[in-house]
C-alpha cells in the first residue's frame, strides 16, 4: 500500500505555513481544523449506534468489550477501558484495552510492534477470546497489521467485530462486521494522526462504552449510579446523585448511603419506595440491576 494515498497522510492546504505563523494564529489554525471533527463523527452515527448495540449485547451475554490498536489508537482504547470500572462499577477486565507491543508501549513507542498480524491474534488468544466478546479494532490509517490480524482472528472465532478508522474503505473496515469511518481530512501536521484522527476516535469510543453501559443498566436518568465511591470526591458525588434523583435532603441521603455501603442505586430505590437496604438490593437484582425498571414495577 502506498500510504501517501491515505487521506490521513496527505498534506493539508490550510496549514502549509505552520512554521511561519504567530502563536495566536497557530492555535487558531489548529482549532479551525478541530471543528471539523464533530461533523465527521456525526456522519458515522448510524454505524456507531450499531456498535453500541453490539457492545451492549456482548455484555448482556457475559462477554467483554475488547479494544485493540497501535500507538495513539491503542492508547485511546486503553484509556477508555481503564475508565469503565470507576465510572460504571464494572469489574476490571470487562472492558479491555490491548496495545501493540504490550503495556510498555503506553509510555514509550515499541518500534515495529504494529507490523505483525500474528501479534494481534496472539494477544487475543492470551485473553482466552470467547465468541460472545466484542472486538473493536482501532487504526487511524485503517491498515495496521496488528489490528487486521486481531480482527480476522476474532471473526474466525465467531465474535462480532467493529473497525474504527479515519480513512474510507479501509482494510480494517473490510475485516469487521461494523465499520465506523469518520473522515476528518488531512491533519494540520501532516500524518500526525494523534490530532484530528485521535480526537475522532476518542469521541467514538466515548459513545460506544457509555452507550453500552446505559443499555447495561449502569445509568439512571443521566447519573452514573453504579459508580464506586472510592474517594472523598466520589462520596460527595454519590450524595449529590441521591439528592438529585430523589429530592431528599443531603443528610438523609448520607444516612441511606451509609446503609448501602455508599452504593447509589439501592439508596435511590430506598428513598423513593421506602424499602430497606436488603429489599432494595433484592428488587434491583430481580430487574437485572436496572434502577428504572425496579422503580416502575
From Swiss-Prot:
UniProt cross-references to InterPro entries, sorted A to Z: Etherase_MurQ, Glucokinase_regulatory_CS, MURQ/GCKR, SIS_dom, SIS_dom_sf
User: Which cysteine pairs make disulfide bonds?
Assistant: none
Segments crossing the lipid bilayer = none
Q: A GO term (biological process) for this protein?
A: peptidoglycan turnover
Active-site residues? 83 (proton donor), 114
- PANTHER family recorded for this chain? GLUCOKINASE REGULATORY PROTEIN (PTHR10088), N-ACETYLMURAMIC ACID 6-PHOSPHATE ETHERASE (PTHR10088:SF5)
What does the record's miscellaneous section state?
A lyase-type mechanism (elimination/hydration) is suggested for the cleavage of the lactyl ether bond of MurNAc 6-phosphate, with the formation of an alpha,beta-unsaturated aldehyde intermediate with (E)-stereochemistry, followed by the syn addition of water to give product.
Write the protein's name.
Answer: N-acetylmuramic acid 6-phosphate etherase
Whose protein is this, by species? Salmonella typhi
The gene for this chain is murQ
Amino acid at each position: 500500500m502506498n500510504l501517501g494515498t491515505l487521506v490521513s497522510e496527505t498534506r493539508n492546504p490550510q496549514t502549509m505555513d505552520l512554521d511561519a505563523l504567530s502563536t495566536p494564529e497557530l492555535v487558531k489554525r489548529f482549532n479551525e481544523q478541530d471543528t471539523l471533527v464533530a461533523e465527521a463523527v456525526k456522519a458515522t452515527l448510524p454505524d456507531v449506534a450499531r456498535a453500541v448495540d453490539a457492545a451492549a449485547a456482548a455484555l448482556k451475554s457475559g462477554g467483554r468489550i475488547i479494544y485493540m490498536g497501535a500507538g495513539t489508537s491503542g492508547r485511546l482504547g486503553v484509556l477508555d477501558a481503564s475508565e469503565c470500572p470507576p465510572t460504571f462499577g464494572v469489574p476490571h477486565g470487562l472492558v479491555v484495552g490491548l496495545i501493540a507491543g504490550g503495556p510498555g508501549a503506553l509510555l514509550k513507542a515499541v518500534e515495529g510492534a504494529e507490523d505483525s498480524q500474528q501479534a494481534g491474534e496472539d494477544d487475543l488468544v492470551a485473553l482466552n477470546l470467547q465468541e460472545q466478546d466484542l472486538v473493536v479494532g482501532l487504526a487511524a490509517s485503517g491498515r495496521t497489521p496488528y489490528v487486521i490480524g486481531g480482527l480476522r482472528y476474532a471473526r474466525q472465532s465467531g465474535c462480532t467485530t467493529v473497525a474504527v478508522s479515519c480513512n474510507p474503505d479501509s482494510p480494517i473496515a473490510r475485516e469487521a462486521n461494523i465499520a465506523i469511518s469518520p473522515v476528518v481530512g488531512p491533519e494540520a501536521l501532516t500524518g500526525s494522526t494523534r490530532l484530528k484522527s485521535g480526537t475522532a476516535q476518542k469521541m467514538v469510543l466515548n459513545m460506544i462504552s457509555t452507550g453500552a453501559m446505559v443499555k447495561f443498566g449502569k445509568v439512571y436518568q443521566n447519573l452514573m449510579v453504579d459508580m464506586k465511591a472510592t474517594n472523598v470526591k466520589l462520596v460527595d458525588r454519590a450524595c449529590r446523585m441521591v439528592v438529585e434523583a430523589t429530592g431528599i435532603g443531603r443528610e438523609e441521603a448520607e444516612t441511606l448511603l451509609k446503609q448501602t455501603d455508599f452504593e447509589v442505586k439501592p439508596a435511590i430505590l430506598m428513598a423513593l419506595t421506602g424499602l430497606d437496604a436488603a429489599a432494595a438490593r433484592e428488587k434491583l437484582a430481580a430487574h437485572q440491576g436496572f434502577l428504572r425498571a425496579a422503580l416502575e414495577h
